[in-house]
């Protein structure tokens, strides 16, 4: 059985405040864990073989991550390495105004990847290992050894992204590493969602997956699990995903409010939003 639903240990409904509890269920000492956001929409063929091989070969890193498309820190890395040439600079901040907050950039980035997928050229983005430390990043896809969480019982703060990506490895005097020789595509941050939902990007990924008969059974099983989860948490399903509750990120909520009221459109930049292949692609 490839997929099992495991209840959140504190009985919390889906939402940001519930995520941290799962780490207490992911600390078996002889196990490697790979965690995905629920809106990872594409994995490069042989993804698991590549990521797990790197994870096994590099036990000193606390977290190992693939190259994540639509992740601000990964976008900065692609820009720095000359793989992409965006119209504006993307900074190393995981909440970068462009790499995290600009929906039109996310659409351009997805279209860039989709073009490479169709041409069978995603390996052109591969750039080896890149170590990162003391820098928070969006943990859209991460891998760890259960034995590394076991000493502290897998207890992670509600602000689990900062804990897992920066605070815990700092306390352990460990670094993290992006293994960019395999790729995962992350659909959207909530700052981008309203725009990307109307872009047809999700349907393009679905079309690509539909053309892979070897995963048809897994897609059907995933659909059954999604329907079971929606039946269990109908209020979340009605929201179209995880609802935003008592977030402390006031800046994020302001952006969300502007999206919902149609005011977050980057009108002054719209004609200048573009993403070109970089010189090193």
Report each predicted region and the residues it spans.
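Active-site-proximal specificity loops/subdomain of glycosyltransferases
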Residues: 1-35, 44-47
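Short catalytic/ligand-binding loop motif for oxyanion handling, primarily in non-cytosolic enzymes
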Residues: 42-44, 71-76, 185-188
């Amino acid at each position: 059985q490839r997929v099992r639903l495991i209840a959140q240990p504190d009985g919390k409904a889906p939402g940001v405040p519930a995520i941290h509890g799962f780490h207490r269920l992911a600390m078996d000492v002889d196990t490697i864990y790979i965690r995905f956001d629920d809106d990872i929409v594409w994995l490069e063929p042989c993804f698991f073989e590549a990521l797990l091989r790197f994870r096994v070969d590099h036990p000193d890193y606390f977290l190992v991550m693939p190259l994540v498309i639509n992740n601000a820190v990964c976008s900065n890395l692609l820009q720095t390495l000359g793989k992409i040439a965006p119209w504006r600079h993307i900074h190393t901040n995981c909440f970068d105004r462009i790499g995290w907050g600009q929906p039109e950039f996310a659409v351009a980035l997805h279209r860039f990847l989709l073009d490479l997928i169709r041409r069978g050229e995603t390996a052109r983005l591969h750039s080896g290992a890149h170590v990162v430390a003391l820098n928070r990043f969006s943990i859209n896809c991460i891998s760890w050894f259960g034995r590394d969480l076991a000493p502290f019982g897998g207890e992670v703060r509600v602000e689990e992204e900062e804990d897992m990506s920066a605070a815990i490895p700092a306390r352990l005097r460990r670094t993290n590493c992006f293994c960019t020789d395999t790729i995962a595509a992350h659909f959207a941050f909530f700052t981008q969602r309203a725009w990307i939902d109307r872009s047809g990007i999700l349907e393009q990924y679905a079309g690509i997956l539909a053309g892979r008969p070897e995963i048809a059974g897994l897609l059907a099983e995933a659909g059954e699990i999604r329907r079971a989860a929606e039946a269990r948490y109908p209020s979340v399903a009605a929201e179209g995903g995880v609802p935003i509750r008592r977030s402390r990120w006031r800046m994020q909520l302001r952006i969300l409010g502007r999206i919902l009221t149609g005011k977050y459109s980057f009108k002054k930049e719209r004609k200048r939003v573009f993403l070109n292949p970089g010189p090193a692609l």
